Regions:
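Structure-specific nucleic-acid interaction/processing domains
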Residues: 1-141
C-alpha cells in the first residue's frame, strides 16, 4: 500500500507535479494507526561553479522514496515494511511559504504534539503574511 504517494485516493506521479513547489503529507502506520504530518519539496536548489561564476540549479528531490524526518517513523518503516504504511498528499503547494503554513496548520489542527497517535515531536515554522499572499484557502482541498 505505502509504496506510492496517494493524492485524492489515486497514485501521484512525476507528471502530476505541474507548477507545484511541494506538498503537505500524512503518513499512516497501518499496523497501529500512528501518523506523521510533514511537508516535502519536489526540488531543491544546488549551486555549481560554471566558468568561475556560481549558478543555481534545480535538482529533483527524493520525494518518491521519502518517509518523513522522524527517526521513530523511519525505524517503524524498517520494522513493519513500507507496504504497511499509507502515504497521502493532503495539499499541493505553489510555494515554500504555503507549504510551511499548511504543514503547521495541519499539525496544530490535529494536535500532533498533544497526542500519542502521532510521530511528530516538534513543530517548526517561519512564515510571514507575504509568503502566503497568493494562497487562497478556498482553492485548497
Amino acid at each position: 500500500m505505502g509504496l506510492n504517494w496517494q493524492y485524492n485516493d489515486k497514485d501521484f506521479t512525476d507528471d502530476l507535479i505541474g507548477d507545484n513547489y511541494g506538498f503537505v503529507y500524512q503518513i499512516t502506520n497501518l499496523a497501529n494507526n500512528k501518523k506523521y504530518i510533514g511537508k516535502k519539496f519536489f526540488y531543491s536548489t544546488k549551486t555549481k561553479q560554471v566558468k568561475g561564476k556560481k549558478k543555481k540549479l534545480k535538482v529533483p528531490s527524493d520525494w518518491q522514496t521519502y518517509y518523513g524526518s522522524s527517526d521513530t517513523l523511519k525505524q517503524d518503516v524498517l520494522q513493519y515494511g513500507p507496504e504497511n504504511f499509507k502515504r497521502e498528499i493532503l495539499h499541493l503547494c505553489k510555494s515554500k511559504g504555503v507549504c510551511g503554513y499548511l504543514e503547521a496548520k495541519e499539525q496544530f489542527t490535529n494536535n500532533v504534539l498533544e497526542s500519542d497517535d502521532y510521530y511528530n515531536t516538534w513543530i517548526m515554522v517561519r512564515v510571514r503574511k507575504s509568503h502566503i499572499k497568493d494562497y487562497n484557502a478556498r482553492s485548497v482541498p
